[in-house]
């Protein structure tokens, strides 16, 4: 009798994806982040579901309902802390996953890469609408400021903003629809993840060398199931440490005050994972220009496959491009820091230099480095 694992219509899909999947024998720990993101998504959906059972999407009771979850619901404080800090873990894994893709040339699997960029945008949208739900000061003013950016769109901008708000300001209608979006988007993300995996399994995984690994493949189970399990445990350790010892470390103190539309927050500051994009937005004094730069900072990922000039796929054997990659990493860390600072000198000029450097590195310097490395590899005699 043939193994059920290989014949059952449903089980064989799981088998081809997680058990008998041929995987390169040399993929490093940088390839763990895909499965870690899957784990993060499951954690977020489960904790979110339990929070939604007790949360009320109403301007009068939203803040109190979150306090009620933390005080009166069994382990409500833990569920909320896991959900809030789980978002930070999600983005940490996302950034490392994207960074891995850029470093090792995984973006040359164009369909997988493009779906990945769409996933990144969807997760960012989910996190933004989710941040509004506790209805604290930063929730309210964050929602007001970020949705207001759409008013920079010529002609239809103001109409669009009021349509999203459901009125003439961020109010009950806005909160209700943001809760609806926050509930539905993770399921859309799950569907996109399946498409992402579908395209990935058409080509198979890339590997650190960037060379075709077909001649040396090993089964996913037990090798990478064990390796992923170690990654899960380490991630869970970090998440639990964060949620249990310093749950509010990454949050904003302003969000402990209920939203007051009459009192303006002294500084509008998104969560840490949006600060790099926020810094790019603020570095341009023109509203429409800032919005376009904000969009470009993420959408630039879509053109990275077109900017690949090297004859080699990975950066593993390309020291000049490696140097530029780590400069880009330092640049993004600088932007993240600047995004959290007030709009005054010297932060303004640092932000502007870092923003220009970000686009310059990706669009000009890295493609040029690829061409130069090609030239250096050619025999000169």
From Swiss-Prot:
<dbReference type="Pfam" id="PF00033">
    <property type="entry name" value="Cytochrome_B"/>
</dbReference>
<protein>
    <recommendedName>
        <fullName>Cytochrome b</fullName>
    </recommendedName>
</protein>
<keyword id="KW-0813">Transport</keyword>
<dbReference type="GO" id="GO:0008121">
    <property type="term" value="F:ubiquinol-cytochrome-c reductase activity"/>
</dbReference>
<keyword id="KW-0472">Membrane</keyword>
<keyword id="KW-0479">Metal-binding</keyword>
<dbReference type="InterPro" id="IPR036150">
    <property type="entry name" value="Cyt_b/b6_C_sf"/>
</dbReference>
<feature type="transmembrane region" description="Helical">
    <location>
        <begin position="288"/>
        <end position="308"/>
    </location>
</feature>
<keyword id="KW-0349">Heme</keyword>
<dbReference type="GO" id="GO:0006122">
    <property type="term" value="P:mitochondrial electron transport, ubiquinol to cytochrome c"/>
</dbReference>
<dbReference type="InterPro" id="IPR005797">
    <property type="entry name" value="Cyt_b/b6_N"/>
</dbReference>
<dbReference type="InterPro" id="IPR030689">
    <property type="entry name" value="Cytochrome_b"/>
</dbReference>
<feature type="transmembrane region" description="Helical">
    <location>
        <begin position="33"/>
        <end position="53"/>
    </location>
</feature>
<dbReference type="GO" id="GO:0045275">
    <property type="term" value="C:respiratory chain complex III"/>
</dbReference>
<keyword id="KW-1133">Transmembrane helix</keyword>
<keyword id="KW-0830">Ubiquinone</keyword>
<dbReference type="InterPro" id="IPR005798">
    <property type="entry name" value="Cyt_b/b6_C"/>
</dbReference>
<dbReference type="InterPro" id="IPR048260">
    <property type="entry name" value="Cytochrome_b_C_euk/bac"/>
</dbReference>
<dbReference type="InterPro" id="IPR048259">
    <property type="entry name" value="Cytochrome_b_N_euk/bac"/>
</dbReference>
<feature type="binding site" description="axial binding residue">
    <location>
        <position position="83"/>
    </location>
    <ligand>
        <name>heme b b562</name>
    </ligand>
</feature>
<feature type="transmembrane region" description="Helical">
    <location>
        <begin position="320"/>
        <end position="340"/>
    </location>
</feature>
<dbReference type="InterPro" id="IPR016174">
    <property type="entry name" value="Di-haem_cyt_TM"/>
</dbReference>
<feature type="transmembrane region" description="Helical">
    <location>
        <begin position="178"/>
        <end position="198"/>
    </location>
</feature>
<dbReference type="Pfam" id="PF00032">
    <property type="entry name" value="Cytochrom_B_C"/>
</dbReference>
<comment type="function">
    <text>Component of the ubiquinol-cytochrome c reductase complex (complex III or cytochrome b-c1 complex) that is part of the mitochondrial respiratory chain. The b-c1 complex mediates electron transfer from ubiquinol to cytochrome c. Contributes to the generation of a proton gradient across the mitochondrial membrane that is then used for ATP synthesis.</text>
</comment>
<feature type="transmembrane region" description="Helical">
    <location>
        <begin position="347"/>
        <end position="367"/>
    </location>
</feature>
<keyword id="KW-0249">Electron transport</keyword>
<dbReference type="GO" id="GO:0046872">
    <property type="term" value="F:metal ion binding"/>
</dbReference>
<dbReference type="InterPro" id="IPR027387">
    <property type="entry name" value="Cytb/b6-like_sf"/>
</dbReference>
<keyword id="KW-0496">Mitochondrion</keyword>
<comment type="subunit">
    <text>The cytochrome bc1 complex contains 11 subunits: 3 respiratory subunits (MT-CYB, CYC1 and UQCRFS1), 2 core proteins (UQCRC1 and UQCRC2) and 6 low-molecular weight proteins (UQCRH/QCR6, UQCRB/QCR7, UQCRQ/QCR8, UQCR10/QCR9, UQCR11/QCR10 and a cleavage product of UQCRFS1). This cytochrome bc1 complex then forms a dimer.</text>
</comment>
<feature type="transmembrane region" description="Helical">
    <location>
        <begin position="77"/>
        <end position="98"/>
    </location>
</feature>
<feature type="binding site" description="axial binding residue">
    <location>
        <position position="182"/>
    </location>
    <ligand>
        <name>heme b b562</name>
    </ligand>
</feature>
<comment type="similarity">
    <text>Belongs to the cytochrome b family.</text>
</comment>
<feature type="binding site">
    <location>
        <position position="201"/>
    </location>
    <ligand>
        <name>a ubiquinone</name>
    </ligand>
</feature>
<feature type="binding site" description="axial binding residue">
    <location>
        <position position="97"/>
    </location>
    <ligand>
        <name>heme b b566</name>
    </ligand>
</feature>
<feature type="binding site" description="axial binding residue">
    <location>
        <position position="196"/>
    </location>
    <ligand>
        <name>heme b b566</name>
    </ligand>
</feature>
<dbReference type="GO" id="GO:0005743">
    <property type="term" value="C:mitochondrial inner membrane"/>
</dbReference>
<keyword id="KW-0679">Respiratory chain</keyword>
<feature type="transmembrane region" description="Helical">
    <location>
        <begin position="113"/>
        <end position="133"/>
    </location>
</feature>
<keyword id="KW-0408">Iron</keyword>
<feature type="transmembrane region" description="Helical">
    <location>
        <begin position="226"/>
        <end position="246"/>
    </location>
</feature>
